[in-house]
Design a protein with these regions (language model features):
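Positively charged n-region of N-terminal signal peptides that target proteins for export
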Residues: 1-4, 140
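Sec-dependent N-terminal signal peptides
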Residues: 4-14
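Sec/Tat signal peptide C-region and signal peptidase I cleavage site
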Residues: 15-19
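Subset of outer-membrane beta-barrel
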Residues: 20-315
Length: 315
């Protein structure tokens, strides 16, 4: 059974690598949900922490979360957008854990105009995702996880609906403090489109590694994102981060997202492109036995940044 599950996960992860890039929807699913992951560049799938928010990035990491943990998250995003999340888990067997989560993104109220640019009213836009998770320790060091998502989106009077799946694997060596992960996110499709044109899911295949250096407080992380698309430079697939672990309970960290920095470049006064800090992120957290608080700041654009906070409590 374990071998069959492991093989199925690997096969399903390989499918998106053959997919072609196209217009995608539900891109709120790409946003960081864990403040710790956000601090390390926004995409991290390898952190071994008692941090339930990390399951949004890799469902296999659910195996490291304490039983009956409740996690709440909030992020203010660009242009006044707001994103909230919640998750709760239960350990159902010695090696098996389940969880449920919700994500909500609201993009504010906008003017509704006709073809003559006359305002006829206002409309709002929002996205919602409800998910169920299952993780299992295949061996003492290898965990697998799956998340099933039900996603809906509203733009004024228009609505769409989709289903998706995340698949994740994590290998952790506690003796050498190596963590290696592979994840395929948002496999699935639309069941109902806004109009007659169906759009693709934001599929994202990622691989990552984290390593804490012996006898030091430093842990480094490197992730490769969007491995199913190779139409841009290899360097822009990298997300890099470093933690300073001040104690078993306190961390501070920083990261750099190469893709975000490239996408947010603008022309300066000398007509040369620059990211002006876009792609950089910072964060800190305190994780006690039952109470956890993590905070991250991310620079998305020269004129826009984001703050993400997670609060978790073990019941």
């Amino acid at each position: 059974m374990k071998k069959n599950l492991f093989a199925l996960l690997l096969i399903c992860m390989a499918i998106p690598l053959m997919a072609q890039e196209s217009q995608t929807t539900y891109n709120f699913l790409r946003l960081p949900t864990s403040a710790h992951a956000a601090a390390l560049g926004g995409d991290n799938i390898t952190l071994i922490e008692d941090d339930e928010a990390l399951i949004f990035h890799n469902p296999a990491l659910l195996s490291t979360v304490s039983d009956r943990s409740l996690c709440l998250g909030y992020m203010n995003y660009m242009s006044g957008s707001q994103v909230a999340s919640a998750a709760f888990n239960r350990i159902i067997r010695e090696r098996a854990t389940v969880a449920v989560s919700a994500q909500y993104a609201h993009y504010g109220t906008m003017k509704q105009m006709d073809e003559n640019h006359v305002q006829t009213g206002e409309f709002s836009a929002k996205d919602i995702a409800l998910s169920g998770y299952f993780s299992y320790l295949l061996t003492d060091r290898l965990a697998g996880g799956i998340a099933a998502k039900f996603i809906t989106s509203y733009i004024g009077d228009y609505n769409s609906f989709a289903v998706g799946v995340d698949l994740g694997l994590n290998y952790y060596d506690p003796d050498r403090e190596w963590s290696v992960s592979l994840v395929a996110k948002n496999l699935g499709g639309q069941l109902k489109s806004y109009d007659e044109q169906y759009e693709s899911m934001p599929i994202d295949v990622q691989a990552g590694v984290s390593k804490r250096f012996a006898n030091t407080p430093f842990r480094v992380s490197a992730s490769l994102i969007d491995l199913n698309h190779w139409d841009y430079k290899f360097i822009y697939h990298w997300v890099l981060g470093v933690d300073l672990l001040l104690s078993k309970s306190i961390w501070v960290g920083g990261g750099y997202n190469c893709r975000r920095a490239n996408e947010m470049k603008i022309l300066g006064v000398d007509d040369e492109e620059g990211s002006h800090g876009a792609g950089l992120s910072l964060g800190a957290g305190i994780n006690l036995e039952r109470l956890k608080l993590n905070l991250a700041y991310g620079k998305y654009h020269v004129s826009s940044s984001s703050v993400l906070i997670n609060f978790a409590y073990t019941l």
